[in-house]
Each structure stands twice: as structure tokens, then as C-alpha cells.
Amino acid sequence: MAVVVVSIMTLFHHPVLAQMNSSSITSSNSITIPTIASSKIPTAITDPNPSYSLDNIFTLVQKSVVQVTSKVSTSLQNPQMQNTTELGSGFVYDTQGHVITASHVVDGTTLSDVTFVDGSRYTAKTIGRDPYSDIAVLQIMGNVIGPLKPLVIENSSGLRVGEQVIAIGHPFGIANTMTNGIIAQTGYLLSIPDIGVFFPDVIQTDAAINPGNSGGPLLNTKGEVIGLNVGRIISIGAPGPYPGLTVAAPSNALLRIVPTLIAKANYSHPYFGLVGSTLTSDLAQTINNLPRNFKGILVNSIVKDGPADKAGIEASTVDKYDKRHWGDIITAVDDHPVIRTEDLISYIEEHKSVGESVKLSAYRNGQIISVNTILVARPPPQIQNSLGISSPPL
């Protein structure tokens, strides 16, 4: 499947359109309840294959899902418009008061309010953000009424198209709303050029996601987290959004990234520093009469002095006579076949870290070559956008 290039309708801040019942909100300043010491995330439910009705799932998880309210600066010229209240969702990660939400929900602020279903409200500090995965971690400040109930985060690698999923969040500020649907697709790379990022292994679902849902959990029928709801797809240059096209970051990204955000406040993503495109059958036949079904990633451009550049990977070029010289076609990474750009980025995200060596196999001038390179940290989006590359580099 090709890279999907879109904008995310609900990936950005949205003003408050509804609020939780203010009469039920309790100030955290007057609460003095001992914090539970253990930070261990609970194991899965005892029954190895439980499946609950939707109402039971809601009862099981509703106390663990929170509304996230942030004050975001929007204008320096108009004092009356300097702060806008933005809404999102989140869920309890552990008993130490860590809450997971979407990074874009808390972009532009360090302090937010988290409100539980019983109306209890607490101030929370953003302690870690990763714009490349759209994951953020908040720390509730002060003591909390009663024990926190973390949600179980399940491995998302075995998800299948057609499985039932449930989303719980706060669309338009409406408290703890449940929607459901099915998994429509998994495992593709979602590219968002206007902010210079992409998300690998995205989960697509038809569960309704609206402004205010971002950062809430996507659940399976056991009430376990399989994804983090981030937005709704609209196609660039076309009217939208389109119903039934919503996306979530996979739970495996949460399992991999959240502990590092808690410990270090940021997460370093490995990257090659190249822009490539999945080789199509038509393009394959154009390149030196390759077999129609030749598979790989055509290297379109290289980030100067990046890992791919230092390893000698060659990109496509056009000479002064307007003749195109095709770049390398990456066919494998560490001897794992590469068919799509998703395969390359997913492999290094899941199996490699910054500073580790990777072997790339590539087709060049009728033969397969192999080169080794050391992965470096992906630069922040604002720096990446200044590299002169039209698409986010892998």
C-alpha cells in the first residue's frame, strides 16, 4: 500500500464547545489522599480470551478516561484572543499519576487540567512530548481522590481488519462518549507534509472521532488499549472530512515511547535521511526495463551528511540536459525484504535505536549492493522542514 498523504482534521486544537458539569467539579487543592506507591501497570484480565459487551466495557474503563483542557496562546496582537481553551482526551497510564494524551492536544502549553468522570479536576504538567508519534505524557500534580485505575495496553501487532474497536473520549467537551466500529486497515504510513511528520503502522477505523476525542483510547472488546486516537482524515485538495476515515497511533508505539518520555521528556527516532517512494510496476519498467513486479523503494533525494549520504546511497538526479538518472532502489534492510516505504520505517522504529548500525541492500546498475550505515536521531519537525526536502525523510 502506498503512503497516504493527508491532513488530519482533528489533529489540531479545537475550542471548547461544551463543558463537563461544573457543579460536580472538585478542587484538587483541598484533597489530601495518600498516593499509591506502586507504578506497575496491571496485567491483562485473568480470562485469556474475554470479550465484553459494549456497556460492560464502558463501565470497566470510564473511570480511567479523562478530559484534557488546555489554555493555548493564539495571538499576541489582540489581548482578548491571547488564550483559547482547547479540549482533548486522555487515559490513566499508571498509579503514579501519568496520563497519556495526544501531543497536539497540549502543544503550546505546559499545564493542563484533567477531569475524571466523577467531575474531579486536577492540574497536570506536560512532562514529555513526541510530535512524530503524536504522543504526550502528563503528570497529575498533587494527590488524587481514590486509587487511579490504569488501562491495560495491549500489543497491537496482531490486529486484524474487521475486528471490533471502541473509542471513548470527550468530543466537543461532551463527557465520556463511546463510539464503536471496526478496524478498516492497519500498517500503512500516514504522511502529513504540512507539519513535516508521518506516522508508521497507523490503525484506520470507522469509529466516529471528532474534535475533543484526540488523545483518547482506542480499545478492543476486552477493554484494552490498542491505539491512541489522533484524528480524522481529509485528502489534500479535496473536500472533506470523510466519514469512516479516522486514525489512531498503534499501542505498540505507546509501549515503546511512553517509558522514555517519562524518563527523558523526549524520544529520539532513528532515521536514514532519505526520501523514497514505493516502486510501482509502471515505474519499474521505466527504470532500465526492470521486471514489472520488481519490489523496493526508489531513493528520490538524500539529506546532505545524513546516514544514507554517508553510506553512499545514491538518489535520482536530472542532469543539465534534462536527462533523469535513477537513484538506488532499496530492496532489503538487515536482510529483511523491503516492498513499501512502510516496511523500511516500521523496521527501524520497532527494531533499531539511534546509534545502531543497519545494512541496506539496494539495486544499482543491474546488481544488488550492500552498505552499512549508523542511524542518527531524526531532527525536530521545524528543523526538518528547513532541509530543502519536499517530503518528510525516512
Residue positions per predicted region:
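C-terminal recognition in membrane/secretory proteostasis and scaffolding
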Residues: 1-35, 56, 125, 139, ...
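A conserved glycine-rich beta-strand in the N-terminal activation segment of trypsin-fold
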Residues: 46-57, 72-96, 120-123, 149-152, ...
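Active-site loop architecture of trypsin-fold serine endopeptidases
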Residues: 75-76, 80-84, 109-112, 145-148, ...
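Terminal peptide-recognition signature
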Residues: 63-68, 90, 97-101, 124, ...
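N-terminal activation segment of mature serine protease catalytic domains
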Residues: 15-79, 95, 102, 111, ...
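Soluble non-cytosolic domains of exported or imported proteins
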Residues: 48, 52, 84-87, 153-160, ...
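Short, conserved beta-turn/loop elements at beta-strand boundaries and strand-helix junctions
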Residues: 71-73, 95, 110, 129-133, ...
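Conserved active-site neighborhood of the chymotrypsin/trypsin-like protease fold
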Residues: 42, 73-74, 92-176, 336-341, ...
